[in-house]
Each structure stands twice: as C-alpha cells, then as structure tokens.
Amino acid sequence: MKEYPSVTVIGAGLAGSEAAWQIASAGIKVTLFEMRPKKKSPAHHSSEFAELVCSNSFGALSSDRAAGLLQEELRTLKSIVINKADKHSVPAGGALAVDRSQFSLSITNELSSHPLITIIRDECPSLPKTQQITILATGPLTSELLAEDIKEFTGEKECHFFDAASPIITGESIDFSTAFRASRYDKGDADYVNCPMNEDSYIKFHSELIKAEQAKLKDFEKESAHFFEGCLPIEQLAKRGIDTMRYGPLKPIGLWDPRWGDVNDKNIRRLKRAHAVVQLRQEDKAGQLWNLVGFQTNLKWGEQKRIFRMIPGLSKAEFIRFGVMHRNTYLESPKLIEPTLQFINRKTLFAAGQLTGTEGYAAAIAGGWLAGTNAALLAKGLDTITLPSSTMIGALTNFVSNSQASLRVKNKKNFQPMPANFGLLPELDNRVHNKRERYKEYRDRALGQIKKLRETLLDKSSYPTTI
C-alpha cells in the first residue's frame, strides 16, 4: 500500500470531524488536534467532538428548502456527521434536530476508533511553519494564541460577532394544563410543546424582558459588540418593538390547542387564539429535556429563571442549562481563500467551517467535507476540486472565496457570515415564477451535479464508499 503524506486537522468540531473522516476514509493518516478538555471554551459543555453549542437543530429537513438541500447534498457525498445526525435525530416537525449528547458521543467514538486517525488532546497554539498539509477548523471559538498566529499569518484583522444559546428545561417541569403539544399548521406529528400567551401576559413579559439585567461583556468586547441577525438574543429582539417577538420566534399563527374549541369556528378562533406562543423543541431521545426555541439570551441566570418562568406553563420550570452568549471569530475569507478552501498564499493550508464565514451547522460540515476531500487529493498528488455554484455547497464556498459576490449579496462594506439560502444560487435557464416550484428546480439541478461529482471522486478512489 502506497504511503501518502499525513494531514493535520486543527479542531474537532463539526468541520474538523468531517474533514478528518473524509481524509482517513481516503486511506491517509490524520493527526486531529482538539484542545478540550485540557483547555475549555466559553460555550462548550463537554469534551466530545462536534458538540452543538447553540440549538440542536440543523434546520429544515425538506430538500426544497435551502438548509434541507444542503443536508441532502452532504448525504449524497457520504458525510459522516450528517449520517450521525440522521441516526440520532429527535422529533422536530419538519426540521432535523438531534439528541446532542448521543450525536457528539457517536462521532467521538467513530473518530477515536479509526486506525488512521491519531487524536491529540491539546491546544495547537500556532500554525505549522512547514508545508505540512493542514486544515484549520477551529471554529468561531478559536483560542487566543492560535487566533493571534492566524492574524499574523494573514495580515488581516479578525472579524467577529456575538452568538448566544437558549436555555434547556426538564419536560416534567412543564405545566400541560396550560401548555399543549402541536406542530405549526398540524404538519406532521405534534413535536413541539407550545406555551400560549394572551395579550396581557405578553405585555408583562415584554416589559420585564427589556429591562432585565444582562451579563456583563468584557471591555474589549463592549467596544465592538454586534450580533448575528440570524441568532439575536431574545432581549435584543424585544427592544426592537412590542410586537417584534410576535412576528418572530413567538408568532402564534398556525398553532391551536384543541381544548380551546373548534378551530374552524371563526368566533371561537377570534376569542380564543393566542396573542403569542413560546415553542419548546425536544433535546433528547427520551423527551426529558426541552429547549426554548429562539430564546438565545445574555441575561443573568437569575433573571432568566425569573422572567422565563413568567411564560404560561413554565412557572415551575427546572433549568438544566441557562442561555449564554459568546464571541464568535471568523476570517475575512474572500481576501484569503480560494474556492477549494486553500489559502491563496499557502496551498497546503486549508480553512473550513464557521471560521470561514459560513453560518449554520450543515454549512460548517460542508466546509469540512470539501477541505477534507481536497486535502486528501492534494496528499495523493491529484488536482483539488471546486463545486459548481449551482450546488448549495458550491454557492456557499463561492460566497466565502469571492469578495465581490460577498459584498454584493450582503450589500455591506464588511464581510458578514452567510447561511445557506437560495439567493446564492445562479438563476435557472428557464424562469419559474412559482417560488415552491422554482426551489424544487434548484434542488433537482443541484443534486444532479452532486451525483456527478460523487462518481468523479469514486473514479479517483479518494472517496468513502461506505460509512
């Protein structure tokens, strides 16, 4: 068996775990660095790989939705992380959500038992000084020492935003004389717990929320604190206006408790419908833990307990984990990396995951898949690949490696993180006016391209045929 150069992967989050698996599956030795548990981050709670620090949801499951298409592309390309997400999924309506503990543990066990993967549980304080093939997948919580070394290597000031996580409570502490099980518009099973608010309880809740005491930021964080729009703390959302939450995570539309009466009776519907609804999503297979959907927060823990217990049905809520906020670092990638995820000024160094400025779990996995695949090809002396911009993976990669496209999409002077969305894809050859039909056409085109790519990689023998 031919001996190929080994590859180093720094960081065992979603991107790093995926990258390490793809490389090892191609028959190449991998050294995987993970600083936890020796050095902890502000947001992680365990030492397991691919830990989900915010929501336990990967987004919409249907492949005619942007997040769902990205997941389906990864399934087609034999992603180990999406495979484990599917195996450890929990009921979440039309979304892919996972039991985060079982999910992370299964990935840790899979990588730890692979004969070609050597795991080093220590901080990697600097980039390799040689031309060793390396993937930088340290994520948004990159350690200070390594972040400084990256800054020196790139010559660019790092970018950042603030992200937050939602609280988790026990299911047995929910009062179901008020709360009820349902999915919006009764689609699928009744996977969510819903806590309805009337106008009076909503106004009181809003009033307390906007004046609640927040956890203090460090001085250097205060100077440039800004939030990612897709994950605003609930208190920041509330401060935008009395009804902002009702048109966001607390929207009541499509949610009805059968105990209120006949939903088809207009008079009953007018009298009984909720003014706002707080939803809870299942955290674990057993249904013992539930997270408050959209309740990312930076409130002090005592304030979280006091104010969130004002929600009808949660007056005796038992908190297993409080919401926290943390600083997320990312690169100004369009100035630094190519569509292959190689650095422009060092072809043996790759970047992957949220560090590159993609947003969302599946997008991080996609970056890990591409960086891992290309690192394996490079180690074998083969040409690296780029993905068509008509695929969601290719579109996201194009976004983080093409400055003009990035600035045009966001219409801002500064590069900002981007989640999967159909606005990144090129127009169809034939214009389709119906939005849902257009999204299906995008899906069919993308998956057709991904299947062709898979066959190409199989021909190169640089691709896992099984998981």
UniProtKB/Swiss-Prot annotation:
Subcellular location: Cytoplasm
Keyword terms of this UniProt record: Cytoplasm, FAD, Flavoprotein, Methyltransferase, NAD, NADP, Transferase, tRNA processing
Cofactor: FAD
Location (main, coarse): cytoplasm
Binding site for FAD: G11, A12, G13, L14, A15, G16
Catalysed transformations (reactions): uridine(54) in tRNA + (6R)-5,10-methylene-5,6,7,8-tetrahydrofolate + NADH + H(+) = 5-methyluridine(54) in tRNA + (6S)-5,6,7,8-tetrahydrofolate + NAD(+); uridine(54) in tRNA + (6R)-5,10-methylene-5,6,7,8-tetrahydrofolate + NADPH + H(+) = 5-methyluridine(54) in tRNA + (6S)-5,6,7,8-tetrahydrofolate + NADP(+)
One GO BP annotation of this record: tRNA methylation
Top enzyme class: transferase
Biological source species: Prochlorococcus marinus (strain NATL1A)
Family classification: Belongs to the MnmG family. TrmFO subfamily.
Entry superkingdom: Bacteria
Role according to the record: Catalyzes the folate-dependent formation of 5-methyl-uridine at position 54 (M-5-U54) in all tRNAs.
Identification of the protein by name: Methylenetetrahydrofolate--tRNA-(uracil-5-)-methyltransferase TrmFO
GO molecular function: flavin adenine dinucleotide binding; tRNA (uracil(54)-C5)-methyltransferase activity, 5,10-methylenetetrahydrofolate-dependent
Regions annotated as coiled coil: none
GO CC annotation: cytosol
Encoding gene per record: trmFO
Enzyme Commission number(s): 2.1.1.74
